[in-house]
Amino acid sequence: MKERIVNLETLDFETSQEVSLRPDLWENYIGQEKIKNNLQISICAAKKRQESLDHMLFFGPPGLGKTSISHIIAKEMETNIKITAAPMIEKSGDLAAILTNLQAKDILFIDEIHRLSPAIEEVLYPAMEDFRLDIIIGSGPAAQTIKIDLPPFTLIGATTRVGMLSNPLRDRFGMSFRMQFYSPSELALIIKKAATKLNQDIKEESADEIAKRSRGTPRIALRLLKRVRDFALVKNSSLMDLNITLHALNELGVNELGFDEADLAYLSLLANAQGKPVGLNTIAASMREDESTIEDVIEPFLLANGYLERTAKGRIATPKTHALLKIPTLKSQSLF
């Protein structure tokens, strides 16, 4: 399947530009108001006590701002942030090297934390609880454990698959936050702020149109903004008006609901099953996608907006999906 413009993965060429568009203060961070309020209280209390923050876990679909909010936390705490991803921590020595280089009150951000191996988790437990690193030297009867004290630090874990975290690891986070999809009005504000940083004039209705097609996700909103800006440049227009925006979005294959070819193929597969549950492995094989992409990228937005039901036997299209695709339902169809 061709590359999706609404893909939620961060592309290499986007990274530096995304950093420049990242909010650096609470007042510039749009959305997630409940999380922001709780964090501001925790940060204020920690600074008054002159302590590090409790360890915290952010979970939810990709592209909702877990990394951005972690950078703001570090700035508010006036400390450093070290960013890594679980797949990069292959051996206990990798984790030990990271932990022993942290300073007091530093923040360690681990993305995809659900992918840590059990052996790495075992090393992490005493580090999180007691700020202590237990290193085993040797093997068998001659093995020795060396204990190394660590400075108080804050671990921030980010995951799209919170259900895959082991209970012992999940229980060691003092705070846990579920990131929510953004409203169109929040996304429109994010788009306008980003356009200003890019020195790009944009009409209000154009920002609204991009927001409407961004699947509730800032990462997609910013990606669409940059692609529409390209179309405006080719058209020799300094202004992103509605006509250019609509033309660009239609050319990119993103419809009024934010669905692209992959979403419609997924929904068609379910709707044509006429009420019979379709298993994840069947969907993945039919779409030539891996199961994690189906679960983490395609399904969350569709689930949140009522286009499918998950059952023990598989996925089922809802009447909303049948109405969208104009595929009639059999009278005997039931979700149960």
From Swiss-Prot:
One Pfam assignment: RuvB_N
Localization per Swiss-Prot or TrEMBL: Cytoplasm
InterPro entries per the UniProt record, alphabetical: AAA+_ATPase, AAA_lid_4, DNA_helicase_Holl-junc_RuvB, P-loop_NTPase, RuvB-like_N, RuvB_C, WH-like_DNA-bd_sf, WH_DNA-bd_sf
Domain of life: Bacteria
Positions of region (Small ATPAse domain (RuvB-S)): 183-253
Entry annotated with the keyword DNA repair: yes
Region (Large ATPase domain (RuvB-L)): 1-182
Any one GO biological process: DNA recombination
Binding site for Mg(2+): T67
Keywords: ATP-binding, Cytoplasm, DNA damage, DNA recombination, DNA repair, DNA-binding, Hydrolase, Nucleotide-binding
Gene Ontology cellular component list: cytoplasm; Holliday junction resolvase complex
Catalytic activity: ATP + H2O = ADP + phosphate + H(+)
EC number: 3.6.4.-
Amino acids binding ATP: L21, R22, G63, K66, T67, S68, E129, D130, F131, R172, Y182, R219
HAMAP family found in the cross-reference section: DNA_HJ_migration_RuvB
Record-linked PANTHER family: HOLLIDAY JUNCTION BRANCH MIGRATION COMPLEX SUBUNIT RUVB, PTHR42848
Function according to Swiss-Prot or TrEMBL: The RuvA-RuvB-RuvC complex processes Holliday junction (HJ) DNA during genetic recombination and DNA repair, while the RuvA-RuvB complex plays an important role in the rescue of blocked DNA replication forks via replication fork reversal (RFR). RuvA specifically binds to HJ cruciform DNA, conferring on it an open structure. The RuvB hexamer acts as an ATP-dependent pump, pulling dsDNA into and through the RuvAB complex. RuvB forms 2 homohexamers on either side of HJ DNA bound by 1 or 2 RuvA tetramers; 4 subunits per hexamer contact DNA at a time.
Domain notes: Has 3 domains, the large (RuvB-L) and small ATPase (RuvB-S) domains and the C-terminal head (RuvB-H) domain. The head domain binds DNA, while the ATPase domains jointly bind ATP, ADP or are empty depending on the state of the subunit in the translocation cycle. During a single DNA translocation step the structure of each domain remains the same, but their relative positions change.
Subunit structure: Homohexamer. Forms an RuvA(8)-RuvB(12)-Holliday junction (HJ) complex. HJ DNA is sandwiched between 2 RuvA tetramers; dsDNA enters through RuvA and exits via RuvB. An RuvB hexamer assembles on each DNA strand where it exits the tetramer. Each RuvB hexamer is contacted by two RuvA subunits (via domain III) on 2 adjacent RuvB subunits; this complex drives branch migration. In the full resolvosome a probable DNA-RuvA(4)-RuvB(12)-RuvC(2) complex forms which resolves the HJ.
Name the UniProt record assigns to this protein: Holliday junction branch migration complex subunit RuvB
Species per Swiss-Prot/TrEMBL record: Helicobacter acinonychis (strain Sheeba)
Chain's gene name: ruvB
